[in-house]
Amino acid sequence: LDRANSMYQRDKNHAAILIWSCGNESFGGKDIFEMSQFFRNTDPTRLVHYEGVCHDRRYNATSDMESQMYPSVEAIKDFLAKDDSKPFICCEYTHAMGNSCGAMHKYTDLTGTEPKYQGGFIWDYIDQSIYKKDRYGKEFQAYGGDFGERPTDYNFSGNGIAYGGNRDASPKMQEVKFNYQNITAQVKEETVKVINKNLFVNTNIFDCKATLQKDGKVVRTAVMETAVEPLSQKEYALPFKKEEKAGEYTVTVSFHLKEDKPWAKAGHEVAFGQYV
């Protein structure tokens, strides 16, 4: 309780704090339940989270949400079919170590079919590595064991969607960005269905561009005007005719910022869809 109070007093005035956590990977029990009650009694405006109750149901009321680590999509479906009394989140999922995040779409697609599934939190955001120079003076991203320490977990700290050091996006970031985009462009031979999953903004606040490529080379581009209201969809004709000459053709419909934002410059791509 003293630890819970210390965290509460430190963070209570931060607007970014939405949920209080009772800890991590610590099973369950009365003391942790009392922590959750402290948060509720002291701050009824925020939710309380604890994953450990999925291993110890004696104090199921500890957490305001069902929280599990790395469940399969089928396991989530099976659980919600039996008990949907709480919203379900993955407090950790799609472990971003090495060449990973490839099946992430199975989880993001689930949000469209399971109303109680609330998504998850990727483990984790940035590689926990630091710059070190090799014997030739060249810098590299060092991890466990690179400093002669033993025992060590070696590269297990390198599991982010962004690289350590300068925070460059890793290839995994592209997969994450696509699955999290708030506009879906379902492109076919002659049409594109634009699904606007944004809660508040129309797609007309973005520039929409269609690009036709043959064998990887741009053949033509065109500007498209879209105006899809939040949480709705609309189908548009593509500005290209169907090509007859042999080759591999791709049609990409993308959405871009019209003006600079605090987080990205004008022209930044926020969503795309492609047909081959």
Region roles according to the model:
Residues 189-191, 248:
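A generic structural signal for beta-strand entry/edge sites
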Residues 94-95, 255, 274-276:
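A short, hydrophobic secondary-structure junction motif
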Residues 206-208, 213-246, 252-258, 263:
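Intrinsically disordered, low-complexity Pro/Gly/Ser/Thr-rich segments with frequent PxxP/GP/PP motifs
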Residues 141-145, 157, 244, 264, ...:
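Generic detector of intrinsically disordered, low-complexity, polar/charged segments
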Residues 1-189, 198-204, 209-218:
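Extended substrate-binding grooves/exosites of carbohydrate-active enzymes
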Residues 260-276:
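Short beta-strand elements
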